[in-house]
Amino acid sequence: MREETNRAKDIEKKKGLVAFDLDHTLLDHNKGAITPSSLEAVKLLKENGYLVVLASGRNMYDRYSFDYLKEIDPHALVQMNGTKVLLDPLGKQEVLMHSVMSKDLLERLIRFGKEHRIALGTAIEDKDYFTEEEQVIQYDLNFVQESDRNFVPVEELLKEEVSALCYCGGVTGAEALRKNFPELNVFPFSRDTGADLLEKGYSKAMGLEKIAEVYQIPREKTVAFGDSFNDEEMRLWANVGVAVGNAIPYIKEKADIVAKPIWEDGIYLTLKDLGMI
């Protein structure tokens, strides 16, 4: 893990920190867009002096995600479930923390995926590195009704700095990965349609803590919104953990607040109730 120590000395004081997951939290997958009321809430939070953090399992700089990053324009970014943390992600891109998966683990995962016909890999810039390419295409067609992948041999991934991988498939494959790779966190997506794969020891909560330290924001002034398993540690870390109304049951049961679903303006209304916008 690399940590950058050259941090900006004159950071603007913020009232508090508000963190948002992307998929099924800000982003409505039924419409393929961030809900307008959530974007308005983010805008008002910034105007009211709060630090807005996007905390996602995605690599927000790949071609499938970068437009969402630009739309949200957060003050800070926790991406790939805390394996990379940045301030000013659309400007200076100051890196606070960056974990790179070991080549040995990456090689074993690729081999396991090929031997067991499990689709896993990642997208970097305009290239897609995956085992079982046909499964990935079908996965795309099932969930976004299109696929424009630019596949390159998955072995080329060993030449890249990789922080996390994506598994495309059902519960059985996720369980096989969890059983055979105890050093991995396997975070299922909220609809059991795949999972994030990353080395244990990293989480969105760890990333938020780093950001809060830089901005000198106490945990008492933090709020986090999420919908799935990879948001659980973030919810526990924040003073107020909010589950959106369309979250999985487990997250809603544990949350401090359960908002309305995102398509019913849940994020906006909750922040208004909290007196933050």
Language-model features and meaning:
Residues 14-31, 235:
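Asp-based phosphoryl-transfer active-site loop
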Residues 112-233, 237, 246:
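Conserved acidic, metal-coordinating active-site core of Asp-based
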Residues 237, 242-277:
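Asp-based, Mg2+/Mn2+-dependent phosphohydrolase catalytic module
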Residues 53, 78, 223-225, 242, ...:
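Hydrophobic/aromatic beta-strand patches that form the interior of the parallel beta-sheet core
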Residues 22, 58, 227-228:
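Active-site metal-binding loops of divalent metal-dependent hydrolases
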Residues 36-136:
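Active-site phosphate-binding/coordination module
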